[in-house]
Amino acid sequence: MKFLSATAVFAAALPSITSASSVESQIETKDLNSSRTGSSSSQSFTEIIPENGAEYRVSGDVSFSDFSNIPEEAETLAISHKEQPNNEVVLSEENHQASFQDSAQNQTENASEGNSPNSENTNQSSTTETESITTDEQVQNDNESAASVPTTVETATAMRLPSYHLQTESLVEGATEEDQNQPNSQNTSSGGGAFYNSQQGPLSFINDPDKDSSLTLSKIRVIGEGGAIYSKGPLSITGLKKLALKENLSQKAGGAICAESTISISSVDSIIFSKNTVTPPAANKPELPNDPSGSNGNDGSDDSNSSGNTDSNESNPNNSASNNTGSENELSSSTPSAQLPNPATPFLSSVSTNSQPIDTEPENAWHAESGSGGAIYSKGKLSIASSKEVVFDHNSATKNGGAIFGEEEIALEKIASLKFDSNTTGEKGGAIHAKTVTLSDIKNTLIFVNNTAKTPEENSLKSSQLNNQNPSEEEHQDTSEGEESQSLETSPITNQDSASSHVAIFRSIAASSSQSNSENIPNADGSTSAGGDAGSSSQPSTPGSDSSINHVIGGGAIYGEAVKIENLSGYGTFSNNNAVDHQISGSTSDVLGGAIYAKTSLTIDSGNSSGTITFSENTTSSKSTTGQVAGGAIFSPSVTITTPVTFSKNSAINATTSSKKDTFGGAIGAISTVSLSKGARFSENIADLGSAIGLVPTTQDAETVQLTTGSYYFEKNKALKRATVYAPIVSIKAHTATFDQNISAEEGSAIYFTKEATIESLGSVLFTGNLVTPIQSTTVLTSGNTSKYGAAIFGQIANASGSQTDNLPLKLIASGGNISFRNNEYRPDATNTGQSTFCSIAGDIKLTMQAAEGKVISFFDAIRTSTKKTGTLASAYDTLDINKSNDSGSINSAFTGTIMFSSELHENKSYIPQNVVLHSGSLILKANTELHVLSFDQKEGSSLIMEPGSVLSNQDIADGSLVVNSLTIDLSSVGRNSASGDNIFMPPELRIVDTSTNSGNSSSTPPSSNTPPNSTPTAQAPISKNFAATTTTPTTPPTTGNIVFLNGVIKLIDPNGTFFQNPALGSDQKISLLVLPSDQTKLQAQKVVLTGDISPKKGYTGTLTLDPQQLQNGVIQALWTFKSYRQWAYIPRDNHFYANSILGSQMSMATVKQGLINDKLNLARFDEVAYNNLWISGLGTMLSQRGGQRSEEMTYYSRGASVALDAKPTQDLIIGAAFSKMIGRSKSLKLERNYTHKGSEYSYQASVYGGSPFYLTINKEAGRSLPLLLQGVISYGYIKHDTVTHYPTIRELNKGEWEDLGWLTALRVSSILKTPKQGDSKRITVYGEVEYSSIRQKQFTETEYDPRYFSNCTYRNLAVPVGLALEGEFKGNDILMYNRFSVAYMPSIYRNSPVCKYQVLSSGEGGEIVCGVPTRNSSRAEYSTQLYLGPLWTLYGSYTLEADAHTLANMINCGARMTF
């Protein structure tokens, strides 16, 4: 049958194609409802996943535990199960299952073993299967075990199972003891001890919808990848209540789980990965065989898991590993049925005694990175989402990713609580290692604590090697000198190679491959070191290695190319995470990122959430490295944080004693950008450079540390060399920025920059208590007699050549808040505060200052900057612009604030080698303060304010002039001084320094007892070639022509009023006001005018006049003519306010009266049935009076309450009483007269009222009479006044308290013109009223400023209002509303004008005050209403408007009546 027809071929192939298609299209669903514990046979423990994948429906609490296919552990496990056979769990199936297994095992013992990954036809007989295995032998690559697949027997067994239900059973009865103890060779060289999926099909676990289920996989230890689960296809776990993987181990990768595809874990309430481990077996050099054939029981063959040899031998022999179960002696004493591996080759995992032909691995086969992923290893994306709790604790890996290793992306999102605790790794990523790491939508807590990336302790490694034993699991780390190389795929090791040849070849390949995988990390000196996955320098050099390439140890918690933490709404903590190089000597590793290492960028963004993150006590450290140590908490080229964050007690420390680089970034280390917003706090962080933030770029370009919005606090950080914040460019634009008590060994304890710095205050910026003093550094400090300045800010170009001619810009902008420098100190001896000097800013700096209106930039410490400019003219140097507008078209309207230099706390002699231009605002030199500049130019509209003893001077390095157009001299400081002779205060000085003796120094130097007048302080010598440049000291020829130009106004001010209280002013004298150059060629004074406080209003009064003759003597003097002494400044006062308060008292009594007549005595009351009534009322008054010839403008407001009780003894009589309280406030504005009145009052009033109708007989004979209604009110009031008068121009006030007594009587007679009729309730009345009021103001005396006495006075008024009223009712829905409206003309037939006498006590001056009262003619309008809600309750209210030519009054009454 050499040839067949096409039809026959198709017919023969059709069943196979159909079967394959059916299998591929269907994923098996299996119920997982029972647990398994312990077995030396993978066939009875491991779930083998079919080719098309499987879906496990977990029902109840299911666990897999206590399994190992590691040879030594497998033998021990078999012995333990022989002793306790009832603990073994086997498959639940029909009885023919056990016999089938026995048959399969017998066949495999009689045939050569091998894996057949492509065997699919499960209908073949066992004999055919055996033949197929024999004829398909292929040579496998040593790294194939990661993808090894089950044997055909296993596949056939699994496919023939009638059911996949798992349940616990005892051992099959009748099984021999030998059968129970005999280890099964299937799956002994692979991973996935519990679930093994060698195909592309998906593997998934779902929850049984009928119950909450959990899955626990524990104490499963395998040779291959994935201690508990291995899947070549996608792996997903969904909907479980709990998922726990604990104490699993892999000797390759993925201590608990390993997947060649994606991993998705979602909607699982609780996820726990604990104490899972990846530990490649250590190669034991003393026991390596010398026989190259590799015989000695193995017949020179390699097993199907030879890739385990490659990975394990890539690990350094010094690496620690977990202790295997049982010792070598125990293994040798196991049952004869189990062939032991050669003790000389412990890195081989095969337990077979027969030669095992292996398949050739495809060239593109995937290899897991050995020693990585302590809990999870994922080739594709790993996603954990929608869980309540996720915990990874005490997982470990010898290489990368102590808990999780991902070759691509890791995403942890929508988790309530996420915790990584005490995970360790030997190189990178103590908890997580991936290309991209994203943590998002963490709701409650995000915790990374005690995670570590470290090399093992060198002494423990040596000890373990000498004693031929392994270190403990806590220390097993991979310090091999390379990663897995692609060369392994093309250079397979034949089975004839000995163990020693394996080790040698693997080391060589790893060393050469490390060059291509290296990472470029900048050194602290600006150079670049190539660091990657190469080993530490303690390892011997190998072929192909490059000693200049540094190995990276980093990411104590997280290592990734890009790391993102997003939308954190809870609280995040990174604490006690460490990246540590323990190598005692000879290390060249770079140690980076104690908590987080991001190779390209780190982003922390809370978005709209309210989350915060704390980084505390994270560390990068090394004992001996000559590489770079940086980023105690975070290291990344680019760091962006837009969430509130705290960094506390993080450190970057290098303990080596020689050839070391400066550590940088105690909290954050970067090489490109650091951007923080929404606030941050840095406290007690430590590094050589940038104890809080260190940005050291590879090139000096645009690398920036940027702090925007929010509040920033830098407190008690310690720079072992320089700076809390170290960067080329520093930009701060924050609401609050505080640098407090930071310490450094050299200049710039708060900020050190090498290119540019901008500090803008939106609320407050404070530099206080920062200290430069010798402290213990990790590198050698610069020696020499060097002046230390710039305790807060230091700027110097990172170029030691001295060829740079530009200075570094430093901009200080107080746009929304103040900027202050105080108590920033250099202390040569840390314990001796007596030798301290205080200087805030120094270095080769070009300053610019801007302060908005009302804002201040204050320097309580000196400024000592230097310059790289040279020349004999001031024009050759930089300009310091003060308050220059950013808009060239505007006139400096944006910045009109104050720049202040003060010696209030200590001596302040500032030296700024720049040409100062004061564009706008004020420059203040406080008492005894000196400012030395190259030149000074004051623009129009600006103000120069000098206090006694202050000095404005040029410098001797170049000729420069002082142009002063408007000088203000503050006279506040009082006292005689020996330097000023008989003058009562030390005058300020405009000084010109002679430049003819200039030595040519371009840096600023203060003359002192220790420094010659023409000497220049030497800048701090460089730490290394890129950190500090020695200040250039050019030589310049002598120059002349320095002049003071004094023009315009000299204004004297005494804001506190202290100067003119000096008894020395009690006589005529001359007072020196300003010291000028005595050489008339250096002074030009034109149109000088003396203004300001030259005629004081209190104290020793007199007049100051300018003495023009003294200008020739280099001093401006004033002639003082004494007049008299006044305790108080005289302010003319109208005095009307106190008398005018009578009107407010009268108005509050009138308001009560209006409520009683209009509401309580309303006409409708007399038509009601006789009942008693309780009235509760609210009252309000507003009086406004315009100013006139005899009165001033005044307003009065009052509010109060009234309670009344009345009765009707008869139908026609109402009698009642009321009690009222009013609280009022009056105000009078007289700003043009420099004072304001504000008064308050409260009054108590008692009233009685009554009313009764009667008839007036008109014609007695005809019986005609006129019906009239009589209403009356009598009130007595007590009013208490309390008033304060402010005098803003003299900052004084006085107080007055007095009482008023008042009476008010009103009698109203009303006549009805139209009476109500049936169906018509309208009523028209006319009325006349007599109203008399009397208010008596008692005498009183003011207190405080210049008090006055006021006599008593009385205001009386008799008015006769005449009006017309219209009344009627509206009725509907059983509710009755009675309304009344009236208008009246109210002439005053008698009114007096109150006259009050006053006297000023200090001077005896006095007079009379005539109170302004309303005009005699006024009008009144009234409206009242009563709403009857039933027989018992009535709501009522009334409103009265009263007006005349100057006064408008509004009175309101409203409340409720209860009838009883």
Swiss-Prot record:
Residues 34-44, 115-137, 290-327, 461-471, 504-548, 995-1018 have a biased composition (Low complexity). Residues 1-20 form the signal peptide. It holds the Pfam family Chlam_PMP. The keyword Transmembrane applies. Keywords: Cell outer membrane, Cell wall, Membrane, Secreted, Signal, Transmembrane, Transmembrane beta strand. The keyword Membrane applies. Residues 21-48, 92-212, 279-372, 455-549, 993-1021 are annotated as: Disordered. PROSITE patterns: AUTOTRANSPORTER. Residues 1167-1460 form the Autotransporter domain. One of its GO terms (cellular component) is extracellular region. It is a peripheral membrane protein. Residues 97-114, 138-155, 328-358, 487-501 have a biased composition (Polar residues). It is found in: Secreted, Cell wall; Cell outer membrane. This is Probable outer membrane protein PmpC. The lineage of its organism: Bacteria, Pseudomonadati, Chlamydiota, Chlamydiia, Chlamydiales.
